[in-house]
Amino acid sequence: MNRSQILTDRQQQELNKAILQYLEPMLTESSSDQEVYRSLQQILVPPSSSSSEAIVDNYLEKKWSTVLRLQRKIIDLENEVGTLRSIVDGQQSVSNGAASVISKDRINWLPNRASKSFPTQQNQLVMASVIHPVLPVIFGGCSDGSIIVWNIVNDDTSIPEKIIRAHTRSINKLAFSVEPADLSKDLTKSKTYIFASCSADLSIKIWDSSSYRHIRTLTGHDHTVSSVAFSQSNPDHLYSVSRDKTVKIWDLVNGYCVKSFTGHSEWVRDIDVASVNSQLSLNNMKVSAELGDFVVTCSNDQSVRVSHAESGAGLALLIGHTHVIEKVKFLPAVSNTILDKFLKENHAQFPSIPQELVSDEIFTTTLGYKYCISGGRDNLLKLWLIPPPTLIPHRSPLPAQHNNSQGWAIADLVGHQSWVKAIAIHPNGRFIFSGSDDKTIKVWDLANLNVTGSVKCVRTLSGHDGFINDLDFAAFNRDSGKEDKIKEDATEEESHQQLMKFIEGRMRCLFISGAADNSIKLWS
């Protein structure tokens, strides 16, 4: 009998006895089974064997459970090492005063290493990935039209919780509703989070995230649907953009397209939505959004466009990229403190920006947006200040009067070696995450603007073997269950600190990436 080159003779004998011990209860019921057992016994433990020692009961099962316990212990220790390494990295991020200080508080949590990998099949490139708004569940949209769901607390990442055969062609985007909704308008039913998927098969589909039930299909686009985003002010509305150059607004209750407008001359790649209702404010968590939503879109025409959703009116154009723009996002209001300080202290660099505009409260009290960030095939990310629209009572907003309705480029984020395909924003508004075809994720610190005058990459995450197509940082619950108020006499700094404390208590330290290497990675 050929001996294992890995095990010693003693270990080989113990393994053979354990196999016989495990099989014995199954092979003693019939005469034929007993014959099989005797044959195995002759092979595994022949009479000539020098070892006659017995082994403990349930030897194989006990060995197996011990291995599993040790594997879990190794994972726990690896996570602990990763956490300690991130703390050391944070302490070393200050070098001769040339970088901003990153504290070890939870509010500044940053991913450091891939702790879990969720694989798909060979023909399932991950094109979109998203984290459930409240549950430890992640969703991946694949190139074959499948939506795959994993529970991240499960030890076996190779077994998904659900596979949904959603579309006939590649999925381009997955998006969750801002809050639970009931599209049936049946008051007796409990509300649940819904999510939307859009595809190259020209359709958008709406799903119940608790049962994975298909609710509705939206059709009307004439070409690939690139991206979708839920309304911030109306939970029943969804926005979509397409290669047919249009932006469409959908009523999810009846499935009708209620508005369609064209603002770009080529393929519209991405969309993000903002309203005064979406901007976190401790003084009033649910502000009435009289103007409704504002949307920002990007296109193959190398421009970023800010529009008023209800009227479709173009309000501002951001020009500066030299190639296709893949992604764009509004920055949250919590980012304003950092960027406002930079503009106020460096006014000479931006003579065309009126000083009073930087401090204008219209952005937070009326509009819900001020800055945005875009990334494209020129390997760059760009930070923009968006000029406010012209507001006339009882009329839709009109194009901005400042700077000929064009936005101001504040800073370029330089570091990627290939196309920037994904952008995510940290809940604290300070850190930007970008994913690229160079197979890396970069973490950018906006606070460096006020130290070095540029946005520095403070961390590069490597681990994927393919183009990175999507990123997501877990959302946090804006509803606190109690009234959160800022003192009327609080200074701007005190207000900001209280806002950070609010976010810190509700943020979830979950960050994922989806890539063309057939995997989603969870970073810790």
Curated annotation (Swiss-Prot):
Taxonomic path: Eukaryota, Fungi, Dikarya, Ascomycota, Saccharomycotina
One of the Pfam families matching this protein, by short name: WD40
GO MF entries: dynein complex binding
Positions annotated as WD repeat: 121-160, 166-217, 220-262, 277-317, 353-394, 415-454, 463-492, 493-524
Chain's gene name: PAC1
Protein name per its UniProtKB record: Nuclear distribution protein PAC1
Entry's Gene Ontology BP terms: cell division; establishment of mitotic spindle orientation; microtubule sliding
Recorded GO CC terms: cytoplasm; microtubule; microtubule associated complex; spindle pole
Summary of subunit composition and partner proteins: Self-associates. Interacts with NDL1 and dynein.
Matching PROSITE patterns: WD_REPEATS_1, WD_REPEATS_2, WD_REPEATS_REGION
